[in-house]
C-alpha cells in the first residue's frame, strides 16, 4: 500500500529502496524477498539490502543515489550516518499518535491497553527514538473487537496517504514541524510501546476479564497470546495459542458455571499455584465479580463440545480461535473434537499482568 501510493506521484522520483536482506523461511528454507523489494524490482528501482547500516560500502551506495529526502516505514533504527545524509532530512511514519506509544510495537500496545483511538504520525528522525518534530497526524478509531492485525490493516491506507502528503509538503515547503511536547494535554500520561516479549504473551489468568481479552486482541495474529496446559495427573506442559476469545461476565458467567456443574459451596482458598507453577483447579479462590460462586482464576470450563473457557479474576474468556502446539489453528468446535476431557487439564501461572504493569509505572 505504501509503495504504490508513494511511487505513483509525478512530483518526484523514487531513486532507490532500502529493505531487509532476503531470508530463508518455511520447511524448505526457501529464500523469500520482501514485498517492497519485489515491487521495486518490477518497477526497475535499485534495491539495497544491507546487513549492517554502518557498512562503508552500503553508505557509499546510499550516497550515490543523491536523494533529497529519505522516507522510513516499518524499518529498524537508523544511525546518524544514514538519517543525516539527505539535504531535506529523513522522516518516519509511526503507527500511533505521537507522542503517545513511542517504541517498537505501537499497534499492539494500543489494543492491549484498550484504546478507542489510534492513528499514524509522520515525524523527522533525530538522535533519539520517536522524539523528532511532528509534521502530520491522522486519527483512526479502534473497535471493541479489533485485533492488532485489524488495526494494522486500517492504518495502512491512512499511513500511505499521510506519507505522500508529508513528502509533498516537504518538497513544496508548506509543512511545519511541531515539538512533540506541544501535543501533550495537561496532566496527560505518556504510554510506551516496548518490544513484545514471551513473558507478555503468557497469559496471567489472575488478571481481569477485560484486560485478558484486550491482551489476546493486541497479540493477534502475531505473536499470539498463549497459556500452558498440564495434565492434572502430571506431565509436561503443552502450549495453547489463543487468537480470539469472548468475554464471559455476570449472568452469562454464572450460567456457564451451572452448565459445567460448578455451583456454590466449593471450598475457597488462596490463589496460589503448586511448587511447579501450576494452578490447582480444585482449589478455588473467592474473587470479587465471581458472584454466586467461589472460583479460582485459570480453571478450565467446557462442555467438551461447543465451548472451552478459562476463568479470570472476575469472569472467564471463552476461546474461539486457538492452536495447540504441533497442531493446526482452528475454531473451538473442531478443536474440542480432537481434545478429549478438557476438564482433566490445568493451566500454568502466566506473567502477562506483571509485564503490562511495568509499562504503567
Describe each model-derived feature in a short phrase:
Residues 20-68:
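N-terminal glycine-/serine-/threonine-rich beta1-alpha1-beta2 phosphate-ribose binding loop
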Amino acid at each position: 500500500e505504501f509503495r504504490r501510493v508513494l511511487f505513483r506521484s509525478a512530483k518526484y522520483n523514487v531513486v532507490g529502496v532500502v529493505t531487509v536482506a532476503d531470508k530463508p523461511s518455511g520447511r524448505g528454507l526457501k529464500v523469500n524477498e520482501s514485498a517492497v523489494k519485489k515491487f521495486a524490482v518490477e518497477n526497475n528501482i535499485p534495491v539495497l539490502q544491507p546487513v549492517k547500516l554502518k557498512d562503508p560500502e552500503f553508505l557509499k551506495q546510499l550516497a550515490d543515489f543523491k536523494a533529497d529526502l529519505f522516507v522510513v516505514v516499518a524499518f529498524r533504527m537508523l544511525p546518524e550516518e544514514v538519517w543525516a545524509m539527505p539535504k531535506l532530512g529523513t522522516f518516519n511514519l509511526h503507527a500511533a499518535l505521537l507522542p503517545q506509544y513511542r517504541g517498537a510495537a505501537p499497534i499492539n500496545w494500543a489494543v492491549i491497553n484498550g484504546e478507542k483511538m489510534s492513528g499514524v504520525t509522520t515525524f523527522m528522525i533525530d538522535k533519539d527514538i520517536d522524539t523528532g518534530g511532528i509534521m502530520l497526524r491522522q486519527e483512526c478509531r479502534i473497535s471493541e473487537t479489533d485485533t492488532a492485525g485489524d488495526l494494522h490493516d486500517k492504518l495502512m491506507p491512512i499511513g500511505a496517504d499521510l506519507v505522500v502528503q508529508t513528502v509533498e509538503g516537504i518538497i513544496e515547503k508548506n509543512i511545519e514541524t511541531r515539538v512533540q511536547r506541544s501535543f501533550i494535554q495537561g496532566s496527560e500520561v505518556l504510554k510506551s510501546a516496548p518490544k513484545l516479549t514471551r513473558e507478555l504473551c503468557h497469559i496471567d489468568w489472575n488478571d481481569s476479564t477485560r484486560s485478558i481479552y484486550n491482551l489476546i486482541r493486541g497479540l493477534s495474529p502475531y505473536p499470539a497470546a498463549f497459556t500452558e496446559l498440564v495434565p492434572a495427573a502430571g506431565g509436561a506442559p503443552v502450549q495453547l495459542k489463543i487468537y480470539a476469545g469472548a468475554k464471559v461476565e455476570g449472568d452469562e458467567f454464572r450460567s456457564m458455571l451451572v452448565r459445567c456443574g460448578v455451583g456454590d459451596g466449593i471450598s475457597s482458598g488462596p490463589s496460589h499455584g503448586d511448587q511447579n507453577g501450576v494452578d490447582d483447579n480444585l482449589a478455588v479462590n473467592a474473587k470479587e465479580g465471581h458472584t454466586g460462586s467461589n472460583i479460582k482464576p485459570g480453571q478450565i470450563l467446557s462442555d467438551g463440545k461447543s465451548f472451552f473457557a478459562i476463568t479470570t479474576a472476575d469472569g472467564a474468556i471463552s476461546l474461539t480461535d486457538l492452536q495447540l502446539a504441533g497442531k493446526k489453528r482452528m475454531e473451538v468446535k473442531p478443536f474440542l473434537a480432537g481434545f478429549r476431557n478438557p476438564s482433566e487439564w490445568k493451566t500454568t501461572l502466566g506473567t502477562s499482568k506483571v509485564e503490562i504493569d511495568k509499562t504503567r509505572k
